[in-house]
């Protein structure tokens, strides 16, 4: 990464976009592999009750007193607090340790009240499996379907993944595309990314690089790492767009 930076800005070497791109590609491929190993879907931004909606707020640590307050609300039956804490413990970060056991408990409480987001996250947990729940396509399908029936974008995207990969259901690219489109139309980043992939590969739809770029761009605006990687690759190779080394590096 440092070498790429040096060639891009001409630090102690002659400025060379192509050389910078070579180094950045190596790093990007490692990141892409790590993200793919980390799970099939992205995690929705955690929103706790009364939290400010500014995009940067998700980067900060959460005060212990605030966590205790949300735990108090969750214990009193506040569904939004239960879902928010479930997400925090599911993914970890912001000063909160990853704890899938607690995440499962909070999601289950909220799902039992009919909360679609909690149902969708239970679907994620069973689709991926782990130390707390055994992987179960049938259980994942049940929760994703319950969430999707309520119009939940995370549930719709989850169903899309199951049909895309034939997990618990016959592989069906047309149905996968349908559910990803429903999710993407609600602004859900994983639906946007998967639509980009389907247009890029021509799965369930005619190959269309312009549409792939459109959906990768939408997903990148929400910060999806794989969307940035795919966009950079397309600009670097001139796939569906005029080749631009500068744009590839900047992305």
What are the roles of these predicted feature ranges?
Residues 8-15, 57-61, 75, 93-98, ...:
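Short coil/turn and helix-start
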Residues 43-84, 89:
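Extended repeat-based solenoid scaffolds, especially LRR ectodomains
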Residues 1-6, 21, 209, 220, ...:
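Catalytic cores of eukaryotic secretory-pathway lumenal/extracellular enzymes that build
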Residues 2-9, 84-92, 121-128, 158-165, ...:
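Hydrophobic face of amphipathic alpha-helices that form TPR/SEL1-like repeat modules
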Residues 14-23, 59-65, 96-106, 133-143, ...:
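Structural signature of tandem alpha-helical TPR/SEL1-like repeats
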Residues 27, 71-73, 109-110, 146-147, ...:
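Canonical positions in the second alpha-helix
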